[in-house]
Regions:
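Alpha-helical interface subdomain recognition
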Residues: 1-80, 84, 89-91, 101-106, ...
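A short, Trp-centered hydrophobic/proline-enriched beta-strand micro-motif
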Residues: 117-125
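Flexible, small-/acidic-enriched active-site or ligand-binding loops
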Residues: 136-138, 191-220
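A short core secondary-structure module
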Residues: 147, 151-195
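Residues immediately within or flanking Cys/His clusters that coordinate Zn2+
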Residues: 410, 426
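Short, cysteine/histidine-rich loop/knuckle motifs that typically chelate Zn2+
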Residues: 414-415, 429-431
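Cys/His-coordinated zinc-binding microdomains
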Residues: 417-419, 433-436
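Short metal-binding segments enriched for Cys and/or His
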Residues: 438-443
């Protein structure tokens, strides 16, 4: 039985997140985008309000949120500012490898630290020449007894300049692809860790993005998140559980753009009436609303699958690329409704459009998601319909054409579908001219 009714706990969290977004994030969103800074005081407020670290399991003292709670929270925060919401959410991304890790002592040690004080943790996989291709990691982890020595550079790291801890993915052998990938929990203050300059971005400027360099950084065996051979799977499992939240970012951003466009269309007059009365505008609004709703349903389904212990990989990929592309389309159409004013910084649409563009890139590009989904559809998905060459003949032929042919063998051309009756197939198909070898006995 399907049930889309949120629980009282979930509704309470949704309301709390919405109130925080409208009161604390929305009034400062434009300012921090303009100055390209991340407000630590805002993050501390979110932490104090219980909107950060909610996904730490209850057995370690956390709230034990499921993914449904995470996507509800993310949508509301992103509606106010995608960039600042990214900064808040990325703590969950950085923490997910620790949640999924098999290293129990490490979990107990760092979860207690994160819950006790205001601590941030970032996710460090991407490199200057590597993004979605996690198996191509070049950051080297060399064995030093039972410990490891890290050398290399990470790039595009959200919260890289402000995080206290880092979930770092490296490899013991760059040529071994996914088999050499491993992961470690690294502290910012360890010797050899240095933070690069903040990367200037087109959008989501309220989120801190930097490079991180590791030079002979010694990582004790106690801080291994995943040993060599298990790091790649840990990264994939992390993405499967966090991609629904990227979809939720897109839903929140798209929802805001749509709401602003509706409000403007009801007030802007042209040719003697509000532009909301024009069918062209109404059709744009209808398509916006349709895409927001379908995106949210996909995001919720992916989150629900994860919460049920199912593998959400495919649904998460679908939700990620559908919702993020829909978001960009909605923001673009919203700007069109605003016309010239949408292109100015006096209204929020231009910022939402800049912010929305990033969703199609991070945590796996749209192209990578399509590759994942197409591979599943063509190689794993089990079709219900029979192959074309095995379709029942009587379903596709005029019954009158079957008269007098009872008992004869039916031969179907696998190229064009033509059916021939006789003891043997024809030497050549009269339609597509393929030879006898193209024919197969039909059921």
């Amino acid at each position: 039985m399907l049930d889309f009714q949120l629980s009282p706990r979930q509704l309470k969290l949704q309301k709390k997140a919405r109130e925080f977004a409208l009161k604390e994030i929305l009034p400062v969103a434009w300012y921090y985008d303009e100055i390209d800074e991340t407000p630590l005081n805002l993050l501390k407020k979110a932490h104090a309000a219980g909107l950060i670290n909610g996904d730490i399991p209850k057995k370690y003292g956390g709230k034990g949120w499921g993914l449904i709670e995470s996507v509800l929270l993310t949508e509301e925060l992103a509606a106010a500012c995608p960039g600042l919401a990214t900064t808040i959410f990325d703590n969950s991304l950085g923490m997910e490898p620790l949640v999924l890790s098999k290293n129990e002592p490490l979990k107990k040690k760092y979860f207690s630290k994160i819950l006790k004080d205001f601590k941030l943790i970032c996710f460090a996989t991407s490199e200057p020449t590597m993004g979605s291709d996690v198996a191509a990691i070049r950051c080297k982890a060399e064995r030093d007894g039972n410990d490891y020595i890290l050398n290399g550079t990470k790039y595009w790291i959200t919260n890289g300049g402000i995080a206290d801890y880092m979930s770092v993915f490296a490899t013991v052998d760059p040529d071994s692809q996914h088999e050499g990938v491993c992961a470690f929990l690294v502290e910012k203050d360890w010797k050899g860790v240095s933070i690069g300059r903040k990367i200037p971005k087109m959008g989501q400027r309220g989120s801190n993005t930097t490079g991180i360099n590791f030079k002979d950084v010694k990582v004790p065996k106690e801080n291994i998140l995943a040993p060599p051979g298990e790091g790649f799977m840990l990264a994939m499992q992390t993405f499967s559980r966090t991609r629904p939240a990227i979809g939720a970012f897109a839903v929140g951003t798209a929802r805001s753009a749509m709401e602003y466009a509706i409000d403007y269309a009801k007030k802007r007059r042209a040719f003697g009436t509000e532009i909301a009365n024009f069918q062209a505008i109404q059709h744009k609004i209808a398509e916006m609303y349709q895409k927001v709703e379908t995106s949210r349903l996909l995001v919720w389904k992916a989150a629900w699958e994860a919460d049920q212990g199912m593998d959400p990989t495919i649904t998460a990929s679908i939700a990620k690329f559908y919702s993020t592309e829909a978001c960009l389309e909605i923001a673009n159409e919203a700007l069109q409704i605003f016309a010239g004013y949408g292109y100015t910084k006096m209204f929020p649409i231009e910022k939402l459009l800049r912010d929305a563009r990033l969703f199609r890139i991070y945590e796996g590009t749209s192209e990578v998601q399509r590759y994942i989904v197409s591979g599943y559809a063509m190689n794993v998905y089990q079709p219900v319909m029979p192959p074309l060459e095995d379709l029942p003949i009587h379903r596709e032929m005029d019954p009158t054409e079957l008269e007098g042919k009872e008992g004869q063998t039916a031969w179907r051309c696998r190229i064009c579908g033509y059916v021939h009756y006789g003891e043997t197939p024809p030497e050549e198909c009269p339609y597509c001219f393929f030879p006898e070898s193209a024919f197969k006995e039909a059921p």
